[in-house]
């Protein structure tokens, strides 16, 4: 989906105005929502933190409303490991209480927006950093490290779970094919 589709395979949407081309999505078996402003793309000013939150809430709410009308077999909505907050080396599970920092609050609201869906199997995937050499966090870091300019991330003591793009796509495929 794009605000300005450039091919017939792309569907118009504008989450800021809660608009989406329902006709173009009619008859789909699944809707997968992964969009949101990148948490590593810019400095976290008050304005950008608002963009991080609103891009997820407006997008997910717009799509949840579409899912409620279209009734596909499954709706997959991204969330993030930020749900748990800083946990150090403690393993976490889906039943663990969320954290209390900014990203945890974003994830709570993000998942609540996905909960607006009713009557459709809904899966919220709490993903770690998706690593791909040509994009995302790793794509931005590799050039710096190759030139000897890389350094520790954050305070260097935090734990981040990560997944390769290939494995992330396989996980989504598994969700689509299994209950």
Where are these regions (language model features)?
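Glycine-rich NAD(P)-binding loop of the Rossmann-fold in SDR/ketoreductase-type enzymes
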Residues: 51-59, 98-105, 109, 163
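Conserved Rossmann-fold NAD(P)-dependent oxidoreductase catalytic core, especially the SDR/UDP-sugar
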Residues: 61-101
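Conserved beta-loop-beta element that borders a ligand/cofactor-binding pocket
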Residues: 79-80, 112-133
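Alpha-helical substrate-binding/gating segment
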Residues: 142-150, 158-179
